[in-house]
Regions:
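A non-catalytic, amphipathic alpha-helix used as a structural packing/dimerization or gating element
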Residues: 6-16
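NAD(P)-dependent Rossmann-like dehydrogenase/reductase catalytic/cofactor-binding core
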Residues: 11, 19-29, 37-124
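Short, small-residue-biased leader/transition segments that mark boundaries at the very start
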Residues: 1-2
Length: 124
């Protein structure tokens, strides 16, 4: 239901963190940025998408990982992104909410409601 908002705001957060780390702004509008994000978010074969959907339905982190023989990069990357956002004093609401769902047992429905109730502002 909120897929377009999450993808758009998610790209903004990824870009914000990447630029803080010294990345080129243009990287995020090309194949390795938005191109990869679109495939990850829309492909039925994406481990990260499937794991995220399961997380959103209430499955716990450890339950999800038990079913994968390969790495679900998004889970580990979420932990690193939160640490980096704290280091650079960045406000990354999606990353923080996902982290709370993954590692602090926050209800995913509450996390989504909090994200969608945020004030609208420029995402460029």
């Amino acid at each position: 239901m909120y897929k377009r908002q999450i993808i758009t705001r998610g790209l903004y957060e990824i870009k914000k963190l990447g630029i803080a780390l010294g990345a080129n702004h243009d990287t995020f509008t090309g194949l390795s940025g938005i191109g990869d994000l679109i495939v990850t978010c829309t492909s039925n074969h994406s481990r990260n998408r499937n794991a995220g959907e399961r997380l959103g339905k209430g499955e716990k982190y450890n339950q999800i990982l038990e079913n994968y023989l390969m790495v679900v990069e998004g889970f580990d990357n979420c932990e690193a992104a939160v640490k980096l956002s704290n280091k650079f004093n960045l406000n990354l609401p999606i990353i923080n909410q996902v982290h709370q769902v993954l590692f602090q047992n926050k209800d995913p429905k509450i996390a989504m409601t909090e994200l969608m109730n945020r004030s609208a502002k420029s995402e460029i």
